[in-house]
Regions:
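Short, well-structured N-terminal submotif of metal-dependent ribonuclease cores
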Residues: 1-58
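Structural motif
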Residues: 12, 131-132
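Short secondary-structure boundary segments
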Residues: 15, 62, 134-136
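Residues that scaffold the ATP/ADP-binding catalytic core of kinase and kinase-like folds
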Residues: 20-22, 71, 141, 158-159
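PIN-domain endoribonuclease scaffold, especially VapC-family toxins
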Residues: 47-106
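Hydrophobic/aromatic ligand-binding patch that stacks against planar heteroaromatic rings
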Residues: 50, 122, 141
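Active-site neighborhoods of divalent-metal-dependent phosphate/nucleic-acid chemistry enzymes
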Residues: 91-130
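Acidic, PIN/NYN-like endoribonuclease modules and their adjacent C-terminal/linker elements
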Residues: 109, 113, 129-130, 136-170
Length: 170
């Protein structure tokens, strides 16, 4: 009988993190970097951490996926087939990491921005340990109901430091 490993920590990434992961610099979309930081793109490094399916479980909502796709298609003019491929990759990554996609009820009104409150709805619904965002309004709410809201470079750095410490203990 094997003993299960530690449970993955639930995390929520803001839409801006998901967009910046493929919109800034050299996107490592086809092979997310691991361990971070390796790409020079902290948002991509965040996805690299989750893609490893080791420590963190990514949670998404239909709203977050739709908004990510909308920004990529309308603002950044990303071709529809590339948007679809990316959203499918995010959904697969969330599932493989131990997270998934859920449609939380809209109950949070703590922030001044409706979109930010949808991120917080998801964090509350899945019991996220932390939220990762590049939005100053959202990070300004940290800690929100006891949950840190940190920026992508902090998350990537924290995960990298944790992995280095584990390797030294072996």
């Amino acid at each position: 009988m094997s003993v299960p490993g530690p449970a993955a920590v639930p995390v929520v990434f803001d839409v801006n993190v998901l967009v910046l992961a493929v919109a800034v610099g050299e996107s490592p979309f086809r092979s997310w970097p691991s361990p971070p930081p390796t790409s020079g793109n902290p948002s991509a490094d965040c996805l690299g951490v989750v893609n490893d399916a080791a420590e963190f479980a990514l949670w998404l909502s239909p709203h977050i996926l739709a908004h990510t796709g909308r920004v990529l298609a309308t603002v950044l003019k990303t071709p529809d087939d590339e948007v679809d491929d990316y959203l499918r990759a995010l959904a697969e990554m969330a599932d493989a990491s131990g997270g998934g996609i859920t449609d939380p009820p809209q109950t949070v009104g703590d922030g001044p921005d409706w979109e930010d409150n949808r991120i917080l709805d998801l964090a509350a619904a899945v019991g996220a340990f932390l939220v990762v965002s590049a939005d100053a309004d959202l990070t300004g709410l940290s800690p929100w109901r006891g949950r840190p809201i940190i920026e992508p470079p902090q998350f990537a750095s924290m995960a990298g430091a944790s992995r280095r410490a584990r390797r030294r203990r072996r």
